Amino acid sequence: MTINTDDQYADGESKTTISSNRRYSTSSFQDQSMEDDGINATLTNDKATLIQVWRPKSYGSVKGQIPAQDRLTYTWREIDVFGQAAIDGKSREPLCSRLRHCFTRQRLVKDFNPRKHLLKNVTGVARSGELLAVMGSSGAGKTTLLNELAFRSPPGVKISPNAIRTLNGVPVTAEQMRARCAYVQQDDLFIPSLTTKEHLMFQAMLRMGRDVPATPIKMHRVDEVLQELSLVKCADTIIGVAGRVKGLSGGERKRTAFRSETLTDPHLLLCDEPTSSLDSFMAQSVLQVLKGMAMKGKTIILTIHQPSSELYCLFDRILLVAEGVAFLGSPYQSADFFSQLGIPCPPNYNPADFYVQMLAIAPNKETECRETIKKICDSFAVSPIARDIIETASQVNGDGGIELTRTKHTTDPYFLQPMEGVDSTGYRASWWTQFYCILWRSWLSVLKDPMLVKVRLLQTAMVASLIGSIYFGQVLDQDGVMNINGSLFLFLTNMTFQNVFAVINVFSAELPVFLREKRSRLYRVDTYFLGKTIAELPLFIAVPFVFTSITYPMIGLKAAISHYLTTLFIVTLVANVSTSFGYLISCASSSISMALSVGPPVVIPFLIFGGFFLNSASVPAYFKYLSYLSWFRYANEALLINQWADHRDGEIGCTRANVTCPASGEIILETFNFRVEDFALDIGCLFALIVLFRLGALFCLWLRSRSKE
């Protein structure tokens, strides 16, 4: 379809000869009554009093309307976004420079391919009380625009330094936007073992600021949002993993993700495809909730792909994106605009489908389609609607000013001060609250998978029984000494590989969830790491206990309770050192497959330096310092000291002639170049390695989080 260009504007641009009287019905929301968003006194006794007294500032008046001075108008000008392409696919900066950028919060500077121009000079205004829908064909840049409006540029994307983004005329930073804006992203990321209610409880504890006085209020808010989007029936259903672990349906997952971001009742809300994976009824329910929020004075911006006619009628304004702005205005204005271009929407045709088709690149018609899109964008750029938008954006950006809001900000700069309930670093919850919530969620994940715990313990018992059967009933002679030494080293080998590979995917598997929640300022890196690792600590104490308790008596090791407890203590330390090393590999690896590939070749050198295969005095000088990181070395020495230090001459039988016989425990230790006086040092080094490897894992996780900001 082509555009009629028979007539001309005075400035030479095309003028259409076709007009349209097509009008669209308004939403039934115009007559919908408002309900109080505040928390009513529905509980009894002290809880009821508490809930009745507290009402968050964002709820405004009794009917839920946001006071005029607190409403937000979001404007953006000259948004140009480029796809990043480093020369030859490699960064031009060395690793040390990139690490320095992580510490200084400077972004990497790479060459950009000018052909990858994702968004071109996008200008727009989103007013409070309006529902603005961003539409366009696939790949038009809808999500890219929303990411930039939310200050969440993905890796490989750069926004022009000339871009201006303001709230009520005041330029905002990423930290200020995080405190005032909720962003519902298209991909739903969850901890699959949690139920819907548990997930919302976790979100409420960390998202609802310190101005919310008590936990019962946050839990009451969770009950409210479960009711609002019909999630009550699945409140106790685990979220699961689509196609792998049965749980929530796609629609229920989408509604849960939506409500996670809107728990705090934000004044500015960005939603990327909030209706994807929803049926028509639930899609309308979600948009009705958004429409109701907009009618209370909130600013709502959403992207949507091919909405139905009924959903289209809910939008106050639409923004059509085709690399640049093809149109921004009300549905009424869009009908007139396209009619004047000679391409009116046919009768009984969904306007949203029609506009998206007009702005799409059809196969085998790329040149023709791009010309049509360019003409539409150029026509809109010189239209009165576009001029009004630019004029409005200029006024909001300070040329004219909005008196109502700017008067308030002049005396009390709302946008330059931390939001209520948010500390100076941008976190709503305290350090202890973050730690407690992460610990609670991680512990729930462990408890929700009892089969995994049972399998781990059963596996440990089976391996221990097998080793005990092989080395059963050793006697103190030459062969027995060799067998006992081998079995003790096998303790270390089994504990290492079993625990390294048990945790090697812990952080890699949750990395997308962690990065998203970290960017939303739900918690710090250290609270996440500590809570996650401490929750798994009981399992890594139980496993060595089961293993040692089975093998120790079966092999016939030194029959004294003190020696058994010492062996159990050393094996437990080894289990936690290897677990810490597994955490380090997991945090340093970009994927689970990479972590699994890196693990074995990294562990093997430490195994060789353990003193069993290579005498500690024979380690090459160039590997000497690396051997100091071998937990096998310290644990093997400690176990052998515990086993042989008390054996005197004559206690070990020499049953073979012409064979060297270690007549005492001291001789056995000298064979390995071990010394009794180094026992305390070995224990201290094992503790030091636990701390060192965990600090290394925390540092790697911190680097990963910084690189995504």
Curated annotation (Swiss-Prot):
Taxonomic placement: Eukaryota, Metazoa, Ecdysozoa, Arthropoda, Hexapoda
Keyword field contains Lyase: no
Gene responsible for this protein: W
Protein name as it appears in the record: Protein white
Membrane topology: Multi-pass membrane protein
Organism of provenance: Anopheles albimanus (New world malaria mosquito)
UniProt keywords, alphabetically: ATP-binding, Glycoprotein, Membrane, Nucleotide-binding, Pigment, Transmembrane, Transmembrane helix, Transport
Sequence intervals crossing the membrane: 457-475, 487-507, 537-555, 564-585, 598-616, 681-700
GO cellular component: cytoplasmic vesicle membrane; plasma membrane
Location in or out of the cell: Membrane
NCBIfam families found in the cross-reference section: 3a01204
Similarity annotation: Belongs to the ABC transporter superfamily. ABCG family. Eye pigment precursor importer (TC 3.A.1.204) subfamily.
Biased composition (Polar residues): 15-32
Residues involved in ATP binding: 136-143, 292-299
Top-level taxon: Eukaryota
Region (Disordered), start-end ranges: 1-35
InterPro entries xrefs: AAA+_ATPase, ABC2_TM, ABC_transporter-like_ATP-bd, ABCG_dom, ABCG_transporters, P-loop_NTPase, Pigment_permease/Abcg
A Pfam entry, by short name: ABC2_membrane
